[in-house]
């Protein structure tokens, strides 16, 4: 309705645009808990921020429409994970993943559903008598391991695929230098440079975590949660009972395995996470080494091609030198012929016809000898010949 009280028709395109903006604000998330149960959450960012207690800047890192480098950030109650197409938030009881249309995310979701409930299944099969065989790793570590394995395998597969096309193309270029082969190698080199930057960023992020025990300690979400529950239980306040059975079982299991991990110096014990990160650091470092070897092979191929081009250039210079020497000799011959061909009165022109034969013969012989002398001097100086 207009300010004058008249009815104004509603623009259908504006309604569609408004609905589209609303759908973008309430982007879908996929939640996977410790039992492998997948739930689709169609909520806005404020609900997610309140759910996992992170800041807006942390959530902005996971926006697929914005470009942010790979990062693993430890927060009070969550781990913010941005590894290429894997954009997730890991808590002590669930994993929240962006509902992306990327086809590479679907296998990661299936892997989360398959591997996250492994500890519970093992406990159900073996019973309480075989606690030693139960997977006692915290939930966040199992989720982090799935994500790291997925991204390392993804980058390794891209590297293998690049090697599959790069090495034959480089070998073909060494055999035949053509515009088609050069353009093909140029595209492969550009792809290798981009892939190397992506692998390098993931490697640097893991290396940064390994170098800082404090950052690794921030990733122990279950330990911090157990410590908070223990401090509450020993106080005069009523005992806090976790409403979630999943988080309650994790607290009891973590307390049963190591009761003292939340007290004293054990709070800085990051050996378990360090071994986990080191394993995938070595894997991503191996992938980076393959790319480095490929870059060195490309550099060697470029050097070989430059040597071939220099050789052809030297051959052209030698040919130019020989043609220049021949041109000098022909010029001398033409000069002598021009002198005798001038229309100048000369006594030699009378009754001395045999002189023409001597002049032609001697001049031709002189030019040939001069040409041989020039080439011999050039060969002696190393200017031609090899």
From Swiss-Prot:
Q: What is its main location?
A: endoplasmic reticulum
**Tissue-level expression:** Isoform 1 is expressed in the whole plant. Isoform 4 is expressed only in roots and flowers.
InterPro entries per record: CorA_TM1_TM2 (IPR045863), MRS2-like (IPR039204)
Q: Which GO MF term does the entry hold, naming one?
A: magnesium ion transmembrane transporter activity
The consequence of inactivating this gene is: Displays plantlets with retarded development under low Mg(2+) concentrations growth conditions.
TM ranges are 321-341, 355-375
Cellular component per GO?
endoplasmic reticulum membrane
Query: Where's the motif Required for magnesium transport activity?
Result: 341-343
Q: How does it sit in the membrane?
A: Multi-pass membrane protein
Q: Which Gene3D superfamilies match?
A: 2.40.128.330, Magnesium transport protein CorA, transmembrane region
Q: Which UniProt keywords apply?
A: Endoplasmic reticulum, Ion transport, Magnesium, Membrane, Transmembrane, Transmembrane helix, Transport
Localization per record: Endoplasmic reticulum membrane
In the UniProt entry for this protein, what further remark is given in the free-text comments?
Has the ability to complement mutants in Salmonella enterica and yeast lacking magnesium transport capability.
Function in brief: Low-affinity magnesium transporter that mediates the influx of magnesium.
Which protein family is it in? Answer: Belongs to the CorA metal ion transporter (MIT) (TC 1.A.35.5) family.
This protein is called Magnesium transporter MRS2-7
Recite the lineage of the species: Eukaryota, Viridiplantae, Streptophyta, Embryophyta, Tracheophyta
């Amino acid at each position: 309705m207009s300010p004058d009280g008249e009815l104004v028709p509603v623009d259908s395109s504006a309604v569609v645009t408004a609905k589209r903006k609303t759908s973008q604000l309430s982007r879908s998330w996929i939640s996977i808990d410790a039992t492998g149960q997948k739930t689709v959450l169609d909520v806005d960012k404020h609900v997610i921020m309140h759910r996992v207690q992170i800041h807006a800047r942390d959530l902005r890192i996971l926006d697929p429409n914005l470009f942010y480098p790979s990062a693993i950030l430890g927060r009070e109650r969550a781990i913010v994970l941005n590894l290429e197409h894997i954009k997730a938030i890991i808590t002590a009881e669930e994993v929240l993943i962006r509902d992306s249309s990327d086809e590479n995310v679907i296998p990661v979701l299936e892997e989360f559903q398959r591997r996250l409930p492994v500890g519970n299944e093992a406990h159900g099969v073996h019973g309480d008598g075989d606690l030693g065989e139960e997977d006692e790793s915290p939930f966040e570590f199992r989720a982090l391991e799935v994500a790291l394995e997925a991204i390392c395998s993804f980058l390794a597969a891209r590297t293998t695929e690049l090697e599959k096309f790069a090495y034959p193309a480089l070998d073909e270029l060494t055999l035949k230098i053509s515009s088609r082969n050069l353009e093909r190698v140029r595209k492969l080199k550009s792809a290798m440079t981009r892939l190397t930057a992506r692998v390098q960023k993931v490697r640097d992020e893991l290396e940064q975590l390994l170098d800082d025990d404090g950052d690794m300690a921030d990733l122990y979400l279950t330990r911090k949660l157990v410590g908070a529950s223990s401090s509450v239980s020993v106080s005069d306040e009523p005992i806090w009972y976790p409403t979630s059975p999943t988080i309650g079982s994790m607290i009891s299991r973590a307390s049963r395995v190591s009761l003292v991990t939340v007290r004293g110096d054990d709070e800085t014990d990051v050996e378990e996470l360090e071994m986990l990160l080191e394993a995938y650091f070595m894997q991503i470092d191996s992938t980076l080494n393959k790319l480095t070897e490929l870059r060195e092979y490309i550099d060697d191929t470029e050097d070989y091609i430059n040597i071939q081009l220099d050789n052809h250039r030297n051959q052209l210079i030698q040919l130019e030198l020989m043609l220049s020497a021949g041109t000098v000799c022909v010029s001398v011959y033409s000069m002598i012929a021009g002198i005798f061909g001038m229309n100048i009165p000369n006594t030699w022109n009378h009754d001395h016809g045999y002189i023409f034969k001597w002049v032609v013969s001697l001049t031709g012989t002189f030019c040939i000898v001069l040409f041989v002398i020039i080439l011999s001097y050039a060969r002696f100086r190393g200017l031609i010949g090899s």
